[in-house]
Amino acid sequence: MTAQHFVRYDVDDKVAVITLDRPDAANAQTAGILKDLDDAWRRADEDPEVRVIVLTTTGKHFSAGHDMTGVDPSADGRALGPRRTDGKLLAEDYYDWETRGYLEYARRWRDIPKPTIAAVQGKCIAAGLMLCWPCDLIVAADNAQFSDPVGLMGIMGVEYHAHTWELGPRKAKEMLFTAGSVTAEEALRSGMVNHVVPLDELRSFTMTLAHRVAQTDPWALRLAKRAVNHTMDTMGFSTAIDSCFDMHHLGHIRALAATGGKTVVMADLERMKAAGRTK
């Protein structure tokens, strides 16, 4: 199975539905899958008949984050991170790769000039947050749990570090300090999600909301989204995201130094194993 088969694209009466369909791996993300997701986002953005975009996943969990096996199950065998023939990496290799493969995707999805809605069920871990946080609205099933446990790897948080904006400073710190989870109800109280619904109503509720939004004038929707996003940027959102991305890479640099230039994925896994936090 190639990576493109993990992403589905459908249109339902002016609503594009992008589905990550890899339930057997808890919708873990590889380089190929992220590229295919980005292609789907671009397709929806460029379709004049689409007014609203919905992001969903299949199975019990929204996403387990990055695929930490280090191998992309696509036909060309693309790896999760950058590679050099000698097996050694420089800090800038990983910085450039994550800029293109993670940060720029999240930024582009956030700024697509159409309303976007994420439907989240089960666990949403680490890079899973980078799928739902760029969306304008989030509908969570009552069993949803949000976490970013990458502190266990010596990293201060995922690449798109929107924690403070999504949860507020104290709840963001608790999530990062403890590697614990934020429940759907806690996320609702923090303003991170818009609605919490029973799991069996997640799809229908999200699509009803999307079709309701699609009834609004598309130019008004575009300007309303731009106004809110621009207000956040004026308050420092984009600058903070850039600064935190740099801090994120200080963690990777530390891992590279500690392991003599091994790939960061392997260095991070070794760190977790040494701490007894993974098998």
PLM feature spans:
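Glycine-rich, phosphate-binding/catalytic loops in enzymes
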Residues: L34-D36, T69-P73, G157
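Conserved CoA-thioester-binding segment of acyl-CoA-metabolizing enzymes
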Residues: M1-K60
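Hydrophobic alpha-helical membrane-association signature
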Residues: I33-D36, G101, L202, C244
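Glycine- (often His-adjacent) and acidic-residue-rich active-site loop
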Residues: A25, T57-E104, L152
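C-terminal alpha-helix plus adjacent terminal tail
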Residues: M1-D13, F62, S74, L80, ...
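Crotonase-fold acyl-CoA enzyme core
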Residues: R107-L221
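Terminal peptide-recognition signature
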Residues: I18, R22, D36-L37, L55, ...
